[in-house]
Regions:
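Conserved helicase motor "Helicase C" RecA-like lobe of SF1/SF2 P-loop NTPases
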Residues: 142-169
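Short secondary-structure boundary/capping segments
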Residues: 39, 79-86, 155-159, 204-207, ...
Length: 285
């Protein structure tokens, strides 16, 4: 009996959600008709707005709205990109001392899609060196793409491969992450998928390697539009993603986690002082 009552209600909820999504899509197309320039994938259209104007009614309905992030970096640019007309910005001091989250810049190659076929060897040597220096800890290897992860993994020596869990496209991400968390051995997980939103405190991961600076993919039409629309958006977004990666280890004031960066493109980030907080700059060894 209850199933018969609940079923139409559930269907109404689903239908209401579809209607809301359709209305949002029509609003986006009215404001940004160029979004339809992106060809459909498997018969499905993906609409990615380059403004937040469609959400302004949500912002305007609030007397005060608190936006919290460790990677705002440049509040003026953040407000411009997200169409925030009036704001107050408060920066709180970092709670974790620099010595507990050191960054080691060990350039092996300038990494981009065009150089993938020739940088796998140098990057693999860098990974091997780090794992020898950290024989008793678990760690992360941020690859940014499945392609680069596979190439670097293939170039590793057999002894190093025994300590590396490779995240391949199509694998169950949750199961892989759970297996990594539960294992006691000093293994490392190589993946493009754990750069943000994951927590690796204390012995869950004491170290990490960044193979490639996480530049947005210029093959994506939306990325190109955003880059053309906002002069500093491309480097700004890259820096935000990079510092999110950096924050995966060392998660408390009594924790410790070090970071090794192998991509020479790191120099493009650190030379712009608006893109690197002083607290991070102080951690570079």
């Amino acid at each position: 009996m209850y199933d018969r009552i609940e079923e139409p209600t559930a269907r109404k909820r689903v239908l209401a959600r579809y209607i809301d999504n359709l209305q949002l899509g029509l609003t986006l197309l009215t404001e940004e008709p160029q979004l339809m320039d992106v060809p459909p994938i498997n018969g499905l259209w993906t609409l990615q707005p380059t403004t937040t104007s469609f959400a302004q009614n949500v912002i305007a309905s609030k007397k005060r709205l608190v936006i919290m992030s460790a990677t705002i970096l440049d509040p003026e640019l953040y407000a411009l990109i997200n169409n925030v007309p009036r704001y107050e910005y408060t920066k709180l001091p970092w709670q974790f001392p620099a010595y507990s989250r050191p960054i080691y810049y060990i350039p092996q190659a300038k990494v981009n899609r065009d150089t993938y076929p020739i940088v796998d060897g140098p990057l693999a040597r860098g990974v091997e060196w780090v794992l020898k220096e950290r024989p008793n800890v678990k760690g992360l290897i941020h690859s940014v793409s499945f392609d680069l992860a596979q190439r670097v993994y293939n170039a590793l020596g057999e002894d190093t491969k025994e300590r590396v869990i490779l995240h391949q496209s199509g694998m169950n991400r949750h199961q892989l992450l759970q297996a990594f968390r539960e294992v006691d051995a000093p293994v490392w997980i190589m993946s493009p998928g754990f750069g943000e939103g994951e927590d690796f405190p204390y012995d869950a991961a004491r170290s990490q390697i960044i193979l490639k600076i996480p530049y947005p993919n210029l093959g994506d039409p939306w990325v190109r539009r955003m880059r053309d629309k906002f002069k500093k958006w491309y480097l700004y977004t890259t820096a935000q993603s990079l510092w999110q990666m950096y924050g995966r280890v060392c998660r408390a004031d009594d924790d410790f986690g070090d970071t090794f960066i192998l991509d020479q493109n790191f120099e493009n980030i650190v030379k712009d002082k608006q893109l690197i907080p002083k607290e991070i700059e102080d951690a570079i060894v």
